[in-house]
Design a protein with these regions (language model features):
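HhH-family (HhH-GPD) DNA N-glycosylase catalytic core used in base-excision repair
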Residues: 1-186
Length: 186
């Protein structure tokens, strides 16, 4: 039997996410933006709620293409508030449009958002070598630094806990436990 981190065992979608994405380093700006959106919407909710609605989010936010999302107007945001397939939180929807604009500005300044965001881990994956799930953490000094920098850049819904979840999703942090078959892979 293959051992996985216990948090993913609730569904096939969660297992697939764990096995194929979580902790794998991301350097594609559109995928990075996708996880920034999904992690912002996760605030106060379980990750399984977001994973179960992921396809709906992808459709609602035009494939997570920041250039398109940045152009969403008031009417488009109101339409999203009526979309039962996503989390209908006005603050999170508005934050996503705002964040797309900030994302594009930083992307232009740095040549890619990837170059900007990976600076918070020294452009490498941090391996925490967790013995088991009881050692999971909700944030780190790196996520604290990332959060402060993103807030200063005008991003919203980027608290340290959200940033840490993003760092795990984007492979900036690899928190697979030692017994997991993906431990120390990235």
């Amino acid at each position: 039997m293959t051992y996985r981190c216990r948090w993913c065992e609730s569904s096939d979608l969660m297992r697939a996410y764990h096995d194929e994405e979580w902790g794998v380093p991301l350097h594609d700006d559109n995928k990075i933006f996708e996880f920034m959106v999904l992690d912002a919407f996760q605030a106060g909710l379980s990750w399984s709620t977001i994973i179960n609605k992921r396809k709906n989010f992808e459709k609602a936010f035009e494939g997570f293409i920041p250039e398109i999302v940045a152009e969403f107007d008031e009417d488009r945001m109101q339409m999203l508030m009526m979309d039962a397939g996503i989390i209908r939180n006005q603050l999170k929807i508005r934050a996503t449009v705002n964040n797309a604009k900030q994302f594009l500005r930083i992307q232009k300044e740095y040549g890619s958002f990837d170059k900007y965001i990976w600076q918070f881990t020294g452009h490498k994956t941090i391996y925490n070598h967790l013995p088991d799930e009881s050692h999971f953490q909700a944030k780190s000094k790196e996520s604290d630094t990332m959060s402060k920098a993103l807030l200063k850049e005008g991003f919203k819904f980027v608290g340290s806990t959200i940033c840490y979840a993003f760092m795990q999703a984007a492979g900036m942090v690899n928190d697979h436990v030692k017994a997991c078959f993906l431990y120390n892979k990235g």
